[in-house]
């Protein structure tokens, strides 16, 4: 429908007197030309924007107040009730400003049947479309009046047109089945037409379609009956295909919706029927029954039972659809799922425990001894109270697996979580229930998962715990790990005291330096040192190779590691303190072997092959060795001394190099990423040697006019600690005397300004590093004699140890020829 929206148009003047004058002139001219003619030769033209109309149609259009409305009112009162309807060339053109150049030449003549005014000054105009017209020439642009010619269809019905008509009628019938809305338009058409006129049938069928305005205008302009009905049939079939597709889509959607609605209604009816018959309870009753059933299997303390009963009473008053109901139900779910009073039954069998520990781990005698002590205490005291053990050692030495083994030998449930990088105390103590998505902390979650009040809880990477504005998790752990407090542990979410005193806590860390002292004070520290070559070799043979072979699907008959291959792998590819890299290299070799076996099996005539991994062919699987030697010098030069260090990754050798260059004054310079403590050690060593030189080297002057440069190789690696004190003095003395230190000597110890040698830590790790670097003469502080004596015999084999309490003792070992 088209309408006029602007009554102030400069082109059309809405003056009714002018319109009547022009209308009179038009009637006179029309009567002069032909008194018998029913349709006028001159018509006012009304532009159409959307779609053209076709003869034989009844068309209602909406006209807003303005020039066209005035023209239509005058025409309706006159004897000439006809107006021309012509489509604009461009869609959505401003019809008040349209000229004849912007209109198509072909349109229709319409008779005004009725004008029905409506609110707002507009009107609904009912038109009867009579004939096709063609604009011959405009008469006056101001009112878009034109001289027109008419086209009457040839009513001769040929066989071909009859066939076309039958096809169109058939398609219309199919359309009526798919879209019942077409029935009303069909009845209007049949009121003043019939299907025996092909032209009218074509026009009607095209009007039913949703074709584009250009396609419809093309049919309107086609006067040849055969061409017109052919185009009409094409558009009608397109409409049929579109209607079928639309109907198919609607059926699918309706089927889905109907099915869902049907299922919903049936379920609701079934639920209602079951409730009426007492066969099914409502959601609230089901929840309460579930909570009550849990409580019957638990020994809930009175203070907790009181809270649970209050919450159940509150739940009974809430609507199941409310948010508060969900919060209350979740809270009760957590309160009732905690295993109140339930404990795992322990087995205190020392022999069986020892077998399990030896089966799972090689070495680690101190750790195994502590576990056996734990079991013995539990057996004598008729129950094992909670303990807090912290396993400290480099990565890959088996800290986490030891925790699993402890749970296994005690027959307790095991729960592990890592606090590395944790910055929110709510992870430990839970969130307040006022927060959306609130939940208890890890401790309560551990109890829920283990369903016992005495599980083994492993807290990994406790040395890497963080802190933020959300709180300090390390401080939250203080309550958890304090035996005097954790029996009344209070989780923020539960807000009910929970007894953690029967939980065995096992913590792991690489270093102790970053653990807060109050937290460290609550733990029993057990150190796991790195492994030496012999230990790694046994671990690889007994544990790593069989396990990796099983994982990859190989057997011992298909691949075999020779001992020298494993030794070569340990020395040249996996020198870390643990065995993680070694395990990765073993799997890498086995994967390559698996590939070769499968490739061989796919050959037409394949034979079974056994792969023997030796030190000679190991490089074909792992590539070039990563490490060459831990020793920088096979023969120690002047000014160099070998120290022993201890890091979070295990023990290591530390070389101290000293050289002197000419300078105006005597001075010392230290490089090699040394920390503050090590810088102080170098100053102490420098000062001590200066003060004691007259005793060690009478007649020598202390580096006259020289600058001494002390360097610690591997400058990219930060180093710190006091244990290199005697090594620095030895390096400086070697430089001053121009005498090399005895070969294969390693040392560690802190020195004071008076020459006293103090004890240091990490004796086992340093001993392992010395063995790895083939140092067989070692100097340890006298204060560390006890630490050395506690080490297993296989670590001491082949080593000559000197214990010293003063640097005078170091001098005798490092420079045996010096008197």
From Swiss-Prot:
Entry annotated with the keyword Acetylation: no
GO molecular function: ATP binding; ATP hydrolysis activity; ATP-dependent peptidase activity; sequence-specific DNA binding; serine-type endopeptidase activity
Residues in Lon N-terminal domain copies: 43-240
Residues at which ATP binds: 393-400
Subcellular location(s) per record: Cytoplasm
SUPFAM superfamilies: P-loop containing nucleoside triphosphate hydrolases, PUA domain-like, Ribosomal protein S5 domain 2-like
Induction per the UniProt record: By heat shock.
Disordered: annotated span: 1-36
SMART domains in the cross-refs: AAA, LON
EC class name: hydrolase
GO BP term, pick one: protein quality control for misfolded or incompletely synthesized proteins
InterPro entries xrefs: AAA+_ATPase, ATPase_AAA_core, Lon_bac, Lon_bac/euk-typ, Lon_lid, Lon_proteolytic, Lon_Prtase, Lon_prtase_N
Keywords recorded for this protein, A-Z: ATP-binding, Cytoplasm, Hydrolase, Nucleotide-binding, Protease, Serine protease, Stress response
Gene Ontology cellular component annotations, sorted alphabetically: cytoplasm
Main location: cytoplasm
Assembly and oligomerization: Homohexamer. Organized in a ring with a central cavity.
Database matches in PANTHER family: LON PROTEASE (PTHR43718), LON PROTEASE HOMOLOG, MITOCHONDRIAL (PTHR43718:SF2)
Protein name per Swiss-Prot or TrEMBL: Lon protease
Organism: Chlamydia pneumoniae (Chlamydophila pneumoniae)
Gene: lon
């Amino acid at each position: 429908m088209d309408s006029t929206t602007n009554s102030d148009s400069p082109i059309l003047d809405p003056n009714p007197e002018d319109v009547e004058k022009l209308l009179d002139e038009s009637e006179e001219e029309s009567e002069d030309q032909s008194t018998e003619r029913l349709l006028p030769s001159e018509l006012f033209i009304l532009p159409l924007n959307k779609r053209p109309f076709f003869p034989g149609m009844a068309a209602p259009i909406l006209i807003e107040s303005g020039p066209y409305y005035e023209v239509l009112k005058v025409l309706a009162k006159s004897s000439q009730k006809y107006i021309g309807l012509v489509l604009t060339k461009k869609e959505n053109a401003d019809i008040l400003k349209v000229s004849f150049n912007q209109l198509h030449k072909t349109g229709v003549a319409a008779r005004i049947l009725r004008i029905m005014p409506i609110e707002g000054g507009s009107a609904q105009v009912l038109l009867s479309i009579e004939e096709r017209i063609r604009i011959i020439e405009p008469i006056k642009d101001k009112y878009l009046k034109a001289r027109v010619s008419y086209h009457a269809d040839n009513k001769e019905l040929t066989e071909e047109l009859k066939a076309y008509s039958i096809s169109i009628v058939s398609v219309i019938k199919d359309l009526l089945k798919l879209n019942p809305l077409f029935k009303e338009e069909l009845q209007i058409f049949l009121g003043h037409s019939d299907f025996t006129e092909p032209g009218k049938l074509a026009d009607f069928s095209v009007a039913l379609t949703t074709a584009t305005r250009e396609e419809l205008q093309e049919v309107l302009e086609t006067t040849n009956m055969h061409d017109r009905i052919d185009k009409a049939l094409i558009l009608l079939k397109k409409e049929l295909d579109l209607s079928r597709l639309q109907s198919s889509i609607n059926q699918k959607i309706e089927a889905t919706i109907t099915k869902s609605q049907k299922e919903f209604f049936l379920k609701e009816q079934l639920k209602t029927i079951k409730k009426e018959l007492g066969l099914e309870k409502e959601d609230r009753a089901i929840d309460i029954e579930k909570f009550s059933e849990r409580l019957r299997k638990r020994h809930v303390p009175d203070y907790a039972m009181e809270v649970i009963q209050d919450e159940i009473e509150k739940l009974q008053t809430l609507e199941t659809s409310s948010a508060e109901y969900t919060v209350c139900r979740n809270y009760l779910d957590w309160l009732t799922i905690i295993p109140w009073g339930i404990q795992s039954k322990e087995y205190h069998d020392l022999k069986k425990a020892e077998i399990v520990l030896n089966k799972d781990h090689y070495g680690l005698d101190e750790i195994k001894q502590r576990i056996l002590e734990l079991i013995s205490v539990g057996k004598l005291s008729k129950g094992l109270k909670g303990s807090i053990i912290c396993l400290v050692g480099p990565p890959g030495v088996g800290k986490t697996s030891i925790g699993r083994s402890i749970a296994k030998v005690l027959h307790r449930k095991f729960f592990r979580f890592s606090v590395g990088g944790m910055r929110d105390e709510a992870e430990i103590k839970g969130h307040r229930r006022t927060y959306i998505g609130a939940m208890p902390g890890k401790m309560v979650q551990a109890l829920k998962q283990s369903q016992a009040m005495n599980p083994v809880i492993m807290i990994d990477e406790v040395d890497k715990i963080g802190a933020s504005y959300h709180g300090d998790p390390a401080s939250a752990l203080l309550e958890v790990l304090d035996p005097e407090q954790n029996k009344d542990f209070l989780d923020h979410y539960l807000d009910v005291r929970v007894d953690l005193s029967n939980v065995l806590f096992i913590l792991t860390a690489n270093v102790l330096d970053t653990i807060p002292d109050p937290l460290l004070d609550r733990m029993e520290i057990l150190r796991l040192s790195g492994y030496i070559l012999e230990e790694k070799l046994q671990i690889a043979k007994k544990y790593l190779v069989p396990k990796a072979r099983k994982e990859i699907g190989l057997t011992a008959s298909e691949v075999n590691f020779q001992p020298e291959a494993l030794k070569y792998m340990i020395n040249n590819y996996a020198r870390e303190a643990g065995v993680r890299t070694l395990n990765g290299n073993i799997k890498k070799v086995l994967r390559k072997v698996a590939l070769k076996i499968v490739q061989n099996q796919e050959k037409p005539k394949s034979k079974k092959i056994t792969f023997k991994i030796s030190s000679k062919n190991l490089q074909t699987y792992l590539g070039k060795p990563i490490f060459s030697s831990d020793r920088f010098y096979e023969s120690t030069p002047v000014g160099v001394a070998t120290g022993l260090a201890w890091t979070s990754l295990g023990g290591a050798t530390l070389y101290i190099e000293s050289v002197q260059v000419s300078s105006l004054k005597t001075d010392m310079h230290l490089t090699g990423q040394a920390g503050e403590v090590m810088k102080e050690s170098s100053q102490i060593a420098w000062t001590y040697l200066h003060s004691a030189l007259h005793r060690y080297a009478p007649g020598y002057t202390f580096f006259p006019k020289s600058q001494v440069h002390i360097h610690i190789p591997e400058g990219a690696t930060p180093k710190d600690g006091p244990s290199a004190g005697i090594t620095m003095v030895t390096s400086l003395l070697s430089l001053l005397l121009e005498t090399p230190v005895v070969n294969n000597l390693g040392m560690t110890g802190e020195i004071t300004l008076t020459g006293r040698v103090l004890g240091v830590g990490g004796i086992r790790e340093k001993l392992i590093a010395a063995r790895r670097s083939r140092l067989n003469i070692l100097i340890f502080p006298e204060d560390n004699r006890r630490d050395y004596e506690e080490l297993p015999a296989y670590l001491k084999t082949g080593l000559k140890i000197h214990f010293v309490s003063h640097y005078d003792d170091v001098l005798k070992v490092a420079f045996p020829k010096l008197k």
